[in-house]
UniProtKB/Swiss-Prot annotation:
Pathway membership, UniProt: Nitrogen metabolism; nitrate reduction (denitrification); dinitrogen from nitrate: step 4/4
Protein name: Nitrous-oxide reductase
Needed co-factor(s): Ca(2+); Cu cation
Residue sites binding Cu cation A2 per the record: C618, W620, C622, H626
Lineage start: Bacteria, Pseudomonadati, Pseudomonadota, Gammaproteobacteria, Pseudomonadales
Source organism (scientific name): Stutzerimonas stutzeri
Annotated positions binding Cu cation A1: H583, C618, C622, M629
Binding site for Ca(2+) 1: K454, E469
COX2-like: annotated segments: 542-638
Binding-site residues, Ca(2+) 2: Y256, E259, M267, D273, N324
The protein's assembly and partners: Homodimer.
Amino acid sequence: MSDKDSKNTPQVPEKLGLSRRGFLGASAVTGAAVAATALGGAVMTRESWAQAVKESKQKIHVGPGELDDYYGFWSGGHQGEVRVLGVPSMRELMRIPVFNVDSATGWGLTNESRHIMGDSAKFLNGDCHHPHISMTDGKYDGKYLFINDKANSRVARIRLDIMKCDKMITVPNVQAIHGLRLQKVPHTKYVFANAEFIIPHPNDGKVFDLQDENSYTMYNAIDAETMEMAFQVIVDGNLDNTDADYTGRFAAATCYNSEKAFDLGGMMRNERDWVVVFDIHAVEAAVKAGDFITLGDSKTPVLDGRKKDGKDSKFTRYVPVPKNPHGCNTSSDGKYFIAAGKLSPTCSMIAIDKLPDLFAGKLADPRDVIVGEPELGLGPLHTTFDGRGNAYTTLFIDSQVVKWNMEEAVRAYKGEKVNYIKQKLDVHYQPGHLHASLCETNEADGKWLVALSKFSKDRFLPVGPLHPENDQLIDISGDEMKLVHDGPTFAEPHDCIMARRDQIKTKKIWDRNDPFFAPTVEMAKKDGINLDTDNKVIRDGNKVRVYMTSMAPAFGVQEFTVKQGDEVTVTITNIDQIEDVSHGFVVVNHGVSMEISPQQTSSITFVADKPGLHWYYCSWFCHALHMEMVGRMMVEPA
């Protein structure tokens, strides 16, 4: 059905003329021709453009039974989860609950998940932005994925062999973990996490003045293996996004609130903010020497990276850049930190090989490390790379992705007349993050790019006032970008990454010795239970522990009796050994639900507060007799 025939398409008042869809549709071919002419290329006809788009669309077709070339990991934003997509098909493969409660798997309900979440299990929400895969020698090693929670100041780790969160930490002394990146070489030793908001220290309600000397935020490093704090560095201003270099020595972060303001006008007052660069080796040496303080009850080493009386600390350098910078991205060739201007139409290119001289005091001006500042368009937010010397930056206000050549931008900064902009592509609409395949590694392959647009407007069937986001897949394998797919997503992915499918190795069934459910195994041992075979009920005062196996289509315990008010823990081990035969356990009217996949042990605790007969059943369709996979909990009145 065409738009003009659809009665479910939002109408545009006549006085406003064409809708944006109509305008862009009418001008697409003309715009492409003008762009090609401006860039010195051949003018594309309507037919040649249509053929090019058709060929690109054929690349994304993944037929029935065929597999995608890449794993894509999307942050779930304020949904609090991570989503796994296949690329280029853009099919959603799995959702990994992290900071949210998930009734399908029982995440946030099961004892195993709550043990991992720790004290923060009390929070039912999260806001995750930046997923990143662990690396060795600048390449994805497929071991872990890390994700931030801005809402409750947490960082979580996901084991990629099982696609489950296995560690979580609340970062002390700070609020709102936003930017998150990983050390790239020699391996991911640290997870670098920006705390965005400035708070008083101690934050005990006695001081609210952000200009106070003891009001600040910190740059945080977490040990990637133990998921414990490694160190924190106090900074001037606030922190937005971050990235690390390919030497293992430097990390950098953008600051958009050098004013330490709390109001919109105040945060835009300065014409320049900065990128703060951290010397990780200097920080490590100070920690090793015991040259640090601690704050409150936390034992985390804290170092002061602020300027004192105009003098730099040995840990940091502040590089002025145009106002309110946002994205901070390391080029895949390892040469540059690139800070996107946001309120400036420029990106600032920091030459990483000049940073040792900056820290050694050999440069007269911190801006001597800036080797390029290309003007790209309105609202530059984030930059990605194709491994062929080109960068791609989102332009939020212009609703475009701009492709530009980095070395030509450096030449232009020196005064040479060169057109470093290669193409501008309309996206729909207002893009934030973007990510090219393997772009944050030294193996960037320049095949696919995803632009994560914040508004979808008229791109999909209307679904009410809340619209989906629009994640658009772009073919960048040739000389020109080609938009090939619109992907609606629920609120609100911020960023994504792509890894080759050979870089991710997953288990087909659980290992019975997996540490994920080790605390539950230990509990069973204390009760003298063999989880692989035993089906028993153990009473310990008003605590009842029900142990059972499950093999489709039957639970090992088909009924058990408790008293009203008992605390009941049900532990189930799925002894099926067939891939994909997952079981579920739901107790009706009790808010109890969990997943038990093959060879997995899961447990859940609840209070049997209602007398009477209560059925439990398998919520997964695991067998032809799935409906008959039930049991009874009989609750005697108190």
